[in-house]
């Protein structure tokens, strides 16, 4: 019995199928209105998915589907996605190249944001250049509006699908820090 439970637990975290990029591209057509056909969102409130880590994308889709992460625009999009669909979409968007965003960062805010990022040790998880790894997102080059929205959600504890790490960090930063961090992160590519 214990062995069966252990094996069941192990296999619950392993995707059963391999991702299909061509299928992901076809499925991504439904995502284009908000995220762009290639994952380079033109709408400031939506994240750039291009170049994001596949593991992170898969987990976010799963969290949206299972109600651990909430976003009204995403709810109807994920309800019918299968595990295979989520794997295909995650791999497709991860394989795309992020394009520089049209954003003129304020130099003073970038400097303050860099200092705050060092203080709260952002690169311990997000890595140098904020490139992300595995289930930690690539945040470099995200639009400032999206970065601000997410940091505020972590601070308000309305986004909690992070195992507590971002929620804890967000409690230590001010509204000004959030704006400064957004300028810094959005200035990276």
Go through each PLM region and give its residues.
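Sec/Tat signal peptide C-region and signal peptidase I cleavage site
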Residues: 14-19
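C-terminal capping alpha-helices of c-type cytochrome domains
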Residues: 79-101, 145, 171-189
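Protein kinase-like catalytic domain
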Residues: 35, 65, 126, 155, ...
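Sequence/structural segment immediately N-terminal to covalent heme-attachment motifs in c-type
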Residues: 20-38, 101, 105-128, 143
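Sec-dependent N-terminal signal peptides
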Residues: 4-13
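Gly/Gly-Pro-rich "capping" loops immediately C-terminal to redox-active cysteine motifs
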Residues: 39-69, 75-81, 114, 118, ...
């Amino acid at each position: 019995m214990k062995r069966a439970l252990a094996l069941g637990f192990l296999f619950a975290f392993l995707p059963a199928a391999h991702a299909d990029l061509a299928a992901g591209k076809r499925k991504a057509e439904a995502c284009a209105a908000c995220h762009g056909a290639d994952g380079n969102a033109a709408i400031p409130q939506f994240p750039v998915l291009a170049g994001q880590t596949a593991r992170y994308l898969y987990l976010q889709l799963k969290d949206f589907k299972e109600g651990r992460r909430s976003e009204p625009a995403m709810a109807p999009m994920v309800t019918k996605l299968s595990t295979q669909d989520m794997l295909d979409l995650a791999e497709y968007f991860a394989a795309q190249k992020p394009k520089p965003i049209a954003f003129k960062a304020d130099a003073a805010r970038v400097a303050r944001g860099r200092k705050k990022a060092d203080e709260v040790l952002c690169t311990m998880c997000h890595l140098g250049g904020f490139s992300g790894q595995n289930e930690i997102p690539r945040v470099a080059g995200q639009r400032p509006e999206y970065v601000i929205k997410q940091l505020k959600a972590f601070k308000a504890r309305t986004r909690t699908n992070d195992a507590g790490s971002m929620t804890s960090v967000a409690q230590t930063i001010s509204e000004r820090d959030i704006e400064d961090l957004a300028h810094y992160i959005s200035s990276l590519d």
